[in-house]
Swiss-Prot record:
Gene3D superfamilies: 3.30.300.20. Its main location: cytoplasm. Transmembrane segments: none annotated. It comes from the Bacteria. It is found in: Cytoplasm. It comes from Ralstonia pickettii (strain 12J). The lineage of its organism: Bacteria, Pseudomonadati, Pseudomonadota, Betaproteobacteria, Burkholderiales. The keyword Cytoplasm applies. The keyword Cytoplasm applies. GO terms for molecular function: ribosomal small subunit binding. The gene is rbfA. Keywords: Cytoplasm, Ribosome biogenesis. GO terms for cellular component: cytosol. This is Ribosome-binding factor A. Monomer. Binds 30S ribosomal subunits, but not 50S ribosomal subunits or 70S ribosomes.
């Protein structure tokens, strides 16, 4: 019996969510580097063959480039720890990317507030 087309996509999402939860815990417990700051994992996307995972993160108290470099340097170690936790055939190679959307949202909100304040002053 052929699989439904949505079932593969659903499995991909479930595995990505599990990877995000496990990685968040592993990063907190295993990576003790004060230069990294407080890292929050925003999302995980997987390739259809589960070979690669893009992990999008934000950081507080550190430069995004520094945190990204540390995370990508520790990606192999995190991969090995993840392999012990996940019960799937292929654990993806991890690629960490800074998610600047939060900062862009804050900047847009600031600009809107500034424009509204200017408009109120003019009235």
């Amino acid at each position: 019996m052929p699989k439904k087309s949505g079932s593969a996509a659903g499995r991909n999402v479930r595995i990505a969510d599990q990877i995000q939860r496990d990685l968040a815990e592993l990063i907190q417990r295993e990576i003790k580097n004060p230069a990294m700051g407080l890292v929050t994992l925003q999302s995980v996307t997987l390739t259809p063959d589960y070979a690669h995972a893009k992990i999008y993160f934000t950081v507080l108290g550190a430069e995004p480039e520094v945190a990204g470099a540390i995370l990508n340097e520790k990606a192999g170690y995190l991969h090995s720890l993840l392999f012990k936790r996940l019960h799937i055939h292929t654990v993806p190679t991890l690629h960490f990317h800074f998610d600047g959307s939060v900062e862009r949202g804050i900047e847009m909100s600031r600009l809107i507030d500034e424009a509204n304040a200017t408009r109120a002053k003019d009235d």
